[in-house]
């Protein structure tokens, strides 16, 4: 999957918008690939729903197995949602090993506490300190054996601590080794976040009603 990683890295840093629809299994991966998308997104939340459990109950190996099944059947670059990293930095290292071997093109981690609280699904975030998250990001960055594997750092701070705090956290995560910043915020805040963070910006939308040009304008 080195070629998929390289293609994804080039797409991310190429300056255009990259769309990554939800992919949960080989069939959906093939559909997304045949439809011409540049990447797919293996969501922890959606995978938990598929298994009829909360994302908080998923294990490293369950997610890695799902990723491996997808990447074994298609060449689509796959973003793997690593949730909160399954514990401390040492657990993040194990996760990177597993996801990299499973063919991930990028791995996303977020700054919620571990184990992840199910309150996230009703809009309540329980965040770790910036220093704790930076330690996880640094561990992830150092653990990868393929430099083309992207580390995506996501913050939930904007919901409850404000946009400025979210931006400050994201820039700290980038300094710690994250390649891409992910913000979960209102559409109207995305342009500000993009202009004030020093890495490509990613976000999640459950019902995308924007055109590619509108996403470019957001940054």
Regions found by a protein language model. Give the residues of each.
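Alpha/beta enzyme core
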Residues: 2-218
């Amino acid at each position: 999957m080195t070629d998929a990683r390289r293609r994804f890295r080039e797409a991310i840093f190429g300056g255009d918008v990259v769309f990554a629809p939800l992919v949960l299994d080989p069939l959906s991966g093939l559909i997304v690939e045949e439809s011409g998308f540049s990447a797919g997104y293996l969501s922890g939340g959606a995978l938990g729903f598929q298994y009829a459990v909360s994302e908080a109950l998923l294990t490293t190996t369950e997610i890695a197995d799902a990723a491996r099944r997808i990447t074994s059947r298609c060449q689509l670059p796959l973003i793997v949602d690593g949730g909160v990293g399954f514990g401390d930095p040492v657990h993040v290292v194990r996760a990177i090993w597993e996801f990299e071997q499973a063919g991930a093109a990028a791995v996303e981690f977020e700054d919620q506490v571990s184990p992840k609280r199910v309150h996230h699904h009703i809009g309540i975030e329980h965040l770790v300190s910036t220093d704790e998250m930076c330690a996880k990001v640094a561990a992830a960055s150092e653990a990868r054996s393929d430099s083309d594997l992207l580390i995506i750092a996501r913050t939930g701070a904007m919901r409850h601590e404000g946009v400025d705090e979210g931006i400050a956290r994201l820039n700290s995560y980038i300094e710690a080794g994250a390649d891409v910043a992910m913000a979960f915020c209102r559409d109207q805040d995305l342009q500000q976040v993009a202009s004030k963070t020093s890495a490509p910006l990613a976000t999640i939308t459950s019902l995308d009603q924007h055109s590619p040009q509108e996403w470019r304008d957001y940054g």
